[in-house]
Amino acid sequence: MSKEAERAELHKTIWRIANDLRGSVDGWDFKSYVLGMLFYRFISENLTAYLNEQERQAGNPEFDYAKLNAKEAAYGLAETVNEKGFFIFPADLFANVRARARHDPNLNETLARVFTTIEASAKGAASEDDFKGLFDDLDVNSNKLGPTVARRNERLVKLLDAVGDLNLGSYTDHTIDAFGDAY
């Protein structure tokens, strides 16, 4: 996909999200939600690609980090935090949370827990200051998303789907800066 096509798709998606959240979230908060979810997706996919590649190089070509259970994933937690600066359990990866989102009546609580867990994973690591408060502006329990938990979760599902549908390409071959462009 060309740089211009990627940029056009990004802008189209951001406008779609804006229409979905219209009337409930102001422009500043809107940016926090979009950028926060983009970043959550980015670090999830980046971690998955990194761990999958490590395992493939070790002779395990069928390995898929996203499919591990928590116990299996915890085996490499300390090493991953040391190498990447953070850790996300497979069930908490963007793609896996998104896949369950429509059927999660507590999606707002799930996301709040995931964000807290990601930030906490860096505690004591060199990256601690980088992750401390990282998701503070992405308030998944805000009344601005809707007056009820069900309404908030509907909007969060739309946000997850819109960000998840973006074609961001490979991390090694980005032709646009998605975060800068979204901002």
Where are these regions (language model features)?
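Non-catalytic, mostly N-terminal accessory regions of nucleic-acid modification and defense proteins
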Residues: 1-183
